[in-house]
C-alpha cells in the first residue's frame, strides 16, 4: 500500500470467486473495508488506509466488465504478453520446493494436449515450482493490465466513456446507451408494487425437449438465431413513460392497449409446443414450464396477442398500460454495423458484440439491493438488536463481522430504484419468445429440442428464415448424425465430421462421457455417475477447499412429462396440464 496509488483501481480477474476469498480477511486488518455485494457476488471493495484512512484503493472484478476467461481475452485483444498455464492441482504443502520434470497434464486445468506439449518443450528436467508460480502470477497481472488498457482506450475513443467509472459491463453499456443513443429520459424506473406485479410474469428463454432421439439415418440440423435479444431490441416497441393502472378488460375500451395484463389464461389442449411460460410449484421447488390448462398470470400484451393466434384465450383482469416506442434501434444498429466491419479476431468485433448483448441485463437486474457493512464485534450486538429481522448473512472476519442486510433507508419505504426497468426486460424476453414461436407448432418443422435461441430439427427449413449475417435470422451451426436429448441443457450430438458435442449443465468436465452413456440414459431410472471437483469457498477461513464429489446424470421431468415404451425406453414427452393452483 503506497500513497502514490491513492484513488487507484486494482483489477483482479474473477476476484469474487477466487482471490478475494484469500484477501478480504487481511484487508480488514490493514484498513477500512466497504464491500459492494449484489446477488451474493462481490462487485467491488472500497479500501481506505493510512493514519486517518485518507488514502483509498478500489478493488474491482474485471470479469464483471469482460465476461470471458483471461486466456480468451488475451487472444481477443491480441496483447503482447498473453496468459500462460500452470499445474494448479500439482501444488501441495509437501512439494513447494519441487524441481524436475514438468508435472503431468492431469494437473493442469482445461488445456489441450498441444498446448501442454508446447509448454513442456520449454524445460529440460529443470521445471521449478516456486519460480514458475511467481512467473505465472506476474504474467497474469501483466496480461490483465494490457487487456484493460486496450479496452479502456477503445471504449473512450468510441464513446468518450471512462471504463473505470463502471463496475460491470451492463452498467457501462447502459451509460453508453443513455448518453449517445437515448433521445429523451422516457424509460420508466419501476419500483415497489408495480415492479413486483410485472415481475410475476418475467421469465427467460423457453427450453424444452420434445423428441429424445433421432432415428438411424435421419440427420438433425442445429440452428441458432443470430443475436436473438439484440434483434428484438432493434425491432420491438418498448413500454415507456409512466404506467397507468386499470381494472377489467382494457381491450374493450382500447383495442390497442399496450402493456402488462394480469389474465386468466386458457391454453388449447391440442397444442404440441405450448408457447406461454409460467412458474409452477413442484416438490423440488419452483420451476418454469410451458404447460396447457388454465391459470392466472401477468403477461406482456404483445405476447398475449401472439398466443391468441395459436389458439390461447385470455380474460384480462387488471394490469398496467404504457406508451410504446422503439428506443434501441440506433444502439443495436450502430454496434451490429461496427461489428460487421471487423473480422472475428479483431478486438473491435469483440467489444461491439459484448456491448450489444449486455444492455438487456441492466434492465432486468434484481432491484432487491442489500447493504453490506463491516462491523466490529464490540458493536455488533447493538446492530443485531436493532435490525435482526433484516440481517440476511453474517460472516466472521477476525475482529469483524461482514453483515449483509436490507438497506436501512429502504426499510420503511420500498420504493427504491437502481436504474432498473423490469418492464423493458420483460418485453425483450417476451419478444424473443414470440420470435422463437414461429418455429413451434409449425407443420413443416419437426422439433426435437429448443433452447432460448436455437432449434434442433430434422426438417428442411425455408430459406427465408436463414441468413447468418442478418439479425434475427437463423444460421446453421451443426448437422448431426446422432442426437440424444434428455432434458434442458442435457444432450449429446455427433456431427457429420465426427465431432462430439456434449452438454451437461452443472458438470464442469464432460469429456469422459460418450454416446453410450446418453443412449443408456434413455432407459427408465438409469443413472450415470461421474466424479468432479466442487470448490467450497470459505471467506471466514480464507480458504477454498476442492472436494471430489459424485455428479449424477439422469433424465428429469422438470419441464415436460416423460413417455416410455413397453421396454421402458424414453420415446417422447407430453405437456404438463395445470390449473389455477399452478402445481405439478
Predicted regions and their residues:
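Conserved acidic
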Residues: 1-584
Amino acid at each position: 500500500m503506497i500513497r502514490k496509488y491513492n484513488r487507484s483501481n486494482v483489477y483482479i480477474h474473477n476476484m469474487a470467486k477466487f482471490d478475494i476469498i484469500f484477501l478480504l480477511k487481511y484487508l480488514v486488518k490493514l484498513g477500512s473495508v466497504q464491500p459492494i455485494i449484489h446477488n451474493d457476488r462481490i462487485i467491488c471493495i472500497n479500501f481506505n488506509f493510512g493514519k486517518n484512512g485518507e488514502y483509498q484503493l478500489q478493488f474491482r472484478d474485471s470479469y464483471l466488465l469482460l465476461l470471458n476467461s483471461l486466456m480468451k481475452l488475451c487472444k481477443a485483444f491480441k496483447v503482447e504478453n498473453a496468459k500462460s498455464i500452470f499445474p494448479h492441482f500439482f501444488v501441495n504443502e509437501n512439494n513447494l520446493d519441487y524441481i524436475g520434470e514438468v508435472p503431468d497434464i492431469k494437473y493442469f486445468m482445461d488445456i489441450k494436449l498441444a498446448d501442454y506439449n508446447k509448454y513442456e518443450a520449454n524445460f529440460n528436467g529443470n521445471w521449478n515450482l516456486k519460480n514458475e508460480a511467481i512467473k505465472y502470477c506476474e504474467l497474469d497481472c501483466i496480461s490483465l493490465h494490457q487487456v484493460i488498457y486496450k479496452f479502456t482506450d477503445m471504449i473512450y475513443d468510441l464513446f468518450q466513456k471512462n471504463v473505470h467509472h463502471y463496475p460491470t459491463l451492463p452498467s457501462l453499456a447502459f451509460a453508453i446507451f443513455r448518453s449517445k443513443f437515448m433521445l429523451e429520459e422516457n424509460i420508466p424506473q419501476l419500483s415497489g408494487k408495480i415492479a413486483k406485479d410485472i415481475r410475476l410474469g418475467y421469465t427467460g428463454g423457453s427450453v424444452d425437449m420434445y423428441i429424445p432421439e433421432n432415428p438411424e439415418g435421419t440427420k438433425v440440423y442445429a440452428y441458432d438465431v443470430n443475436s436473438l435479444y439484440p434483434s428484438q431490441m432493434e425491432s420491438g416497441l418498448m413500454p415507456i413513460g409512466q404506467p397507468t393502472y386499470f381494472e377489467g378488460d382494457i381491450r374493450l375500451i382500447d383495442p390497442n392497449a399496450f402493456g402488462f395484463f394480469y389474465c386468466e389464461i386458457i391454453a388449447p389442449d391440442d397444442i404440441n409446443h405450448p408457447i406461454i411460460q409460467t412458474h409452477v410449484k413442484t416438490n423440488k421447488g419452483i420451476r418454469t414450464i410451458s404447460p396447457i390448462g388454465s391459470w392466472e398470470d401477468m403477461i406482456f400484451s404483445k405476447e398475449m396477442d401472439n398466443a391468441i393466434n395459436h389458439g390461447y384465450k385470455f380474460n384480462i383482469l387488471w394490469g398496467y398500460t404504457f406508451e410504446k416506442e422503439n428506443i434501441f434501434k440506433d444502439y443495436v444498429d450502430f454496434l451490429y454495423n461496427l461489428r460487421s466491419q471487423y473480422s472475428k479476431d479483431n478486438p473491435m468485433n469483440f467489444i461491439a458484440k459484448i456491448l450489444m448483448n449486455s444492455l438487456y441485463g441492466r434492465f432486468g437486474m434484481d432491484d432487491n439491493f442489500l447493504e453490506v457493512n463491516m462491523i466490529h464485534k464490540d458493536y455488533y450486538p447493538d446492530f443485531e438488536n436493532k435490525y435482526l429481522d433484516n440481517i440476511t448473512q453474517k460472516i466472521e472476519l477476525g475482529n469483524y463481522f461482514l453483515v449483509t442486510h436490507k438497506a436501512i433507508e429502504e426499510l420503511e419505504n420500498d420504493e427504491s430504484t437502481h436504474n432498473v426497468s423490469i418492464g423493458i426486460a420483460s418485453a425483450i424476453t417476451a419478444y424473443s419468445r414470440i420470435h422463437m414461436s414461429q418455429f413451434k407448432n409449425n407443420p413443416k418443422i419437426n422439433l426435437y429440442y429448443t433452447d432460448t435461441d436455437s432449434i434442433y430439427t430434422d426438417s428442411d427449413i425455408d430459406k427465408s428464415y436463414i441468413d447468418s449475417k442478418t439479425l434475427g435470422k437463423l444460421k446453421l451451426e451443426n448437422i448431426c448424425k446422432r442426437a440424444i436429448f434428455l432434458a434442458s441443457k442435457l444432450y449429446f450430438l455427433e456431427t457429420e465430421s465426427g465431432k462430439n458435442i456434449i452438454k451437461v449443465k452443472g458438470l464442469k468436465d464432460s469429456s469422459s462421457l460418450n454416446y453410450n452413456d446418453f443412449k443408456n440414459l434413455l432407459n427408465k431410472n438409469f443413472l450415470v455417475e461421474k466424479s468432479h471437483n466442487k470448490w467450497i469457498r470459505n471467506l471466514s477461513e480464507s480458504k477454498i477447499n476442492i472436494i471430489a464429489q459424485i455428479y449424477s446424470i439422469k433424465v428429469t421431468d422438470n419441464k415436460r412429462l416423460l413417455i416410455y415404451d413397453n421396454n421402458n425406453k424414453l420415446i417422447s414427452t407430453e405437456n404438463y396440464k395445470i390449473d389455477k393452483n399452478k402445481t405439478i
